[in-house]
């Protein structure tokens, strides 16, 4: 502290106080004064350097405070922005969750409605007429086999049984509506065609029926069978899967038999029965039997043509309930 005190006391060169110092200290000369001046200048420079350091330190502290305040303000703004962003994300998340929940609820409702529609479209196929029709269809190949083996008497008996089942299934379905089914409307003519095809092929094989008549009957039945598969595909609503296509309980179309088709069925059964009985009762190649062959060919071709001309009335697509 001594240099600073001396410096405060000596603020300017000591030329004017040389005599006093010489008198007090007992020294004299200009060299002593010069030494004092140099000492005062050095101590003043040191004091100025100390003041500069303090001033710079205060400046740096102020600058750091300002920088810290700016950073604090920036962090505060970012915190506010982050809170707003987080709030927006939470609101968006809640909106998406509600939207997904609502969409899932709608899908579940739609699935329930679709299941109810499919259940309504299904029908009971385990009816007595359908069982009789199925038994006739299963028996048809065996009747053909018996005829090919030459057992015409057994073949006649089985044919009579098949004819009785054909009459019974129709009577039961008309008398008791609960036993009627749209599936049966397709199954019955298909079983008749299977029976007729088995019989005409086996009778033609044993030379009891002409080849041309067999060709007409088989061609007509194959044509109608193919048309039935096409109509089934057209009338089946999406999705058109293999399992739904062959699902017998899911009926999409109905076959309306015509008067001509019923007459043709009777004529065909009479022709088959009489041709099968010819070797039993010995009237092979009888003119009346040959005339019946031509009549059967005519009615068979006429029914095929009528199905084509009146296909919109014969095959009815079942409209879905709205």
UniProtKB/Swiss-Prot annotation:
Q: Which Pfam families match?
A: CDP-OH_P_transf
Q: What are the recorded Gene Ontology BP terms?
A: cardiolipin biosynthetic process; mitochondrial membrane organization
What GO CC annotations are associated with the protein? Answer: mitochondrial inner membrane; mitochondrion
The record lists the catalysed reaction(s) as: a CDP-1,2-diacyl-sn-glycerol + a 1,2-diacyl-sn-glycero-3-phospho-(1'-sn-glycerol) = a cardiolipin + CMP + H(+)
Q: Which residues cross the membrane?
A: 143-163, 199-219, 289-309
Where found, per UniProt?
Answer: Mitochondrion inner membrane
Report the coiled-coil segments: none
How does this chain sit within the bilayer? Multi-pass membrane protein
| EC supergroup of this enzyme | transferase
Give UniProt keywords alphabetically: Lipid biosynthesis, Lipid metabolism, Membrane, Mitochondrion, Mitochondrion inner membrane, Phospholipid biosynthesis, Phospholipid metabolism, Transferase, Transmembrane, Transmembrane helix
Write the Enzyme Commission number(s) for this entry. Answer: 2.7.8.41
Q: What is the residue range of the signal peptide feature?
A: none
Q: What this chain does, per the record?
A: Catalyzes the synthesis of cardiolipin (CL) (diphosphatidylglycerol) by specifically transferring a phosphatidyl group from CDP-diacylglycerol to phosphatidylglycerol (PG). CL is a key phospholipid in mitochondrial membranes and plays important roles in maintaining the functional integrity and dynamics of mitochondria under both optimal and stress conditions.
* Annotated family: Belongs to the CDP-alcohol phosphatidyltransferase class-I family.
Give the protein's recorded name: Probable cardiolipin synthase (CMP-forming)
Q: Give the originating organism.
A: Drosophila melanogaster
User: From which lineage does this chain's organism come?
Assistant: Eukaryota, Metazoa, Ecdysozoa, Arthropoda, Hexapoda
Which gene is annotated as encoding this protein in its UniProt record? CLS
